[in-house]
Amino acid sequence: MASPDPPATSYAPSDVPSGVALFLTIPFAFFLPELIFGFLVWTMVAATHIVYPLLQGWVMYVSLTSFLISLMFLLSYLFGFYKRFESWRVLDSLYHGTTGILYMSAAVLQVHATIVSEKLLDPRIYYINSAASFFAFIATLLYILHAFSIYYH
């Protein structure tokens, strides 16, 4: 005997605001600060004398790649591309969680490069590296908060 069909489920698209309201609603309000602090990190690292290319190369890779992918996510929300996929929320949460972890590793490596640059270079390079380290930790916090807020939203 055949079992009855399962009850029909309906997929209700989420309530993603459009326009300026996107930047005022949690979790989407994290996009602009992520982009701003990410931009500051990679421009400050690029503006300094690279002490250890392997360490600061990883910082540049993480910050620049995260900046570009976050910009693509923001544009997909602004233009409504997310409506084509049902699993966009999971993808967004996984991306921001993974990026938070990668940014933490980049921030720690940037701090190490900053400590080394204190003894080797002029003070201006040290100050720029210090600011890049601080902004990298802020970006890490923003990405992790974004991941949790999109997951629990």
Swiss-Prot record:
Pfam families: MARVEL. InterPro entries: MAL, Marvel, MARVEL-CKLF_proteins. One of its GO terms (molecular function) is structural constituent of myelin sheath. Residues 22-153 form the MARVEL domain. It is a multi-pass membrane protein. The keyword Transmembrane applies. The keyword Transmembrane applies. Its main location: membrane. GO terms for biological process: cholesterol homeostasis; myelination. Belongs to the MAL family. This is MAL-like protein. It comes from Homo sapiens (Human). The lineage of its organism: Eukaryota, Metazoa, Chordata, Craniata, Vertebrata. The gene is MALL.
